[in-house]
């Protein structure tokens, strides 16, 4: 079992739900919550052993402030950094990073004690990773 999954499973279900609600909120930020995004979040809910009721709660569109308050309860820095990374990946998935997505990721990070320069560092790492993946497709003629 990887370190992140281990950390997630140590948290109570309420905290795991809060973590996943952040994904739902970010996925809705561009006005479109498609089936691929829903499937991705459902699979994460299964991986993190969230109950069916908890999974339904994840898909209820909570207000930003409520999500932020719930995320403040998560004290693991490792989980916070992982959440920022995953939110950055999700935000870049459609090749359009909106101001609303950027603001939400910043608010999440700050609520969880992640410094703005660390959030920027993670975001830049995600962008570099995406660029390398695209370059690999060209190099290996995929």
Regions found by a protein language model. Give the residues of each.
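Small-residue-enriched hydrophobic alpha-helices in membranes
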Residues: 1-27, 34-142
């Amino acid at each position: 079992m990887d370190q992140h999954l281990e950390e997630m499973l140590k948290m109570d279900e309420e905290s795991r739900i809060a973590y996943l609600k952040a994904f739902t909120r970010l996925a809705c930020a561009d006005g479109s919550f498609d089936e691929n995004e829903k499937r991705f979040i459902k699979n994460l809910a299964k991986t993190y052993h969230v109950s069916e009721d908890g999974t339904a709660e994840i898909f209820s569109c909570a207000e930003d402030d409520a999500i932020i308050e719930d995320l403040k309860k998560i004290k693991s820095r490792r989980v916070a950094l992982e959440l920022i990374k995953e939110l950055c990946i999700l935000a870049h998935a459609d090749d359009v990073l909106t101001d609303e997505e950027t603001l939400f990721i910043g608010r999440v990070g700050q609520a969880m004690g992640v410094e703005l320069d660390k959030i920027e560092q993670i975001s830049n790492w995600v962008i570099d990773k995406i660029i390398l993946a695209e370059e690999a497709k060209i190099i290996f003629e995929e």
